């Protein structure tokens, strides 16, 4: 059973030091960033090498769409979650359908490369006061956030 710690890696290939760290019984997850990505084939090779070291370690990425999409070349560009919140105002059903489709695409592309999960959806409310959240949030309305997060999650299953 993997442990509670999360680590990152420095580049697009594992070093001997990183292999040793991944083998630690305390490590449960490796998080990837843009610096770990060149293209889908390289990402698949990296994820395969991580899982070869420790098959039960999780590989995650902050890949939400919009400006927080760590892998771009070879991946479908997913709009920001705020875009779907705006669509909700005009057509809630279309927003939910679009998000379910986006979730499917996002998860399918990540899984094809060996990534186990993404830190999406963001459930923060958009109070309009935090640039870090901004377009990452669906809406200020918690009911809208709940419905849209559910739609995205259903697509990711």
Which sequence ranges carry the predicted segments?
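Boundary/entry segment of secreted carbohydrate-active catalytic domains
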Residues: 1-15
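Enzymes and membrane/adaptor proteins characterized by extended Gly/Ser/Thr/Asp/Glu-rich
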Residues: 26-148
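N-proximal short alpha-helices
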Residues: 3, 16-19, 118-121
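N-terminal glycine-rich anion-binding loops that anchor highly charged ligand groups
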Residues: 14-31
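Phosphate/pyrophosphate-binding betaalpha-module
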Residues: 148-157
């Amino acid at each position: 059973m993997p442990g509670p710690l999360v680590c990152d890696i420095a580049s697009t290939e594992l070093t001997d030091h990183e292999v040793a760290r991944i083998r630690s019984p305390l490590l449960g997850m490796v998080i990837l960033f843009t610096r770990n990505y060149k293209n889908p084939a390289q990402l698949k090779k990296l994820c395969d090498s991580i899982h070869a070291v420790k098959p039960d370690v999780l590989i995650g990425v902050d890949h939400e769409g919009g400006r927080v999409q760590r892998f771009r070349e070879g991946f479908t560009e997913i709009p920001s979650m705020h875009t779907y919140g705006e669509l909700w105002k005009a057509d809630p059903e279309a927003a939910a359908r679009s998000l379910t489709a986006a979730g499917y695409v996002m998860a399918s592309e990540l899984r094809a490369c060996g990534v186990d999960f993404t830190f999406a959806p963001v459930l923060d409310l958009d109070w309009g006061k935090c640039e870090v959240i901004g377009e990452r949030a669906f809406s200020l309305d918690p009911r809208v956030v709940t419905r849209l997060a559910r739609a995205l999650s259903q697509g990711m299953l």
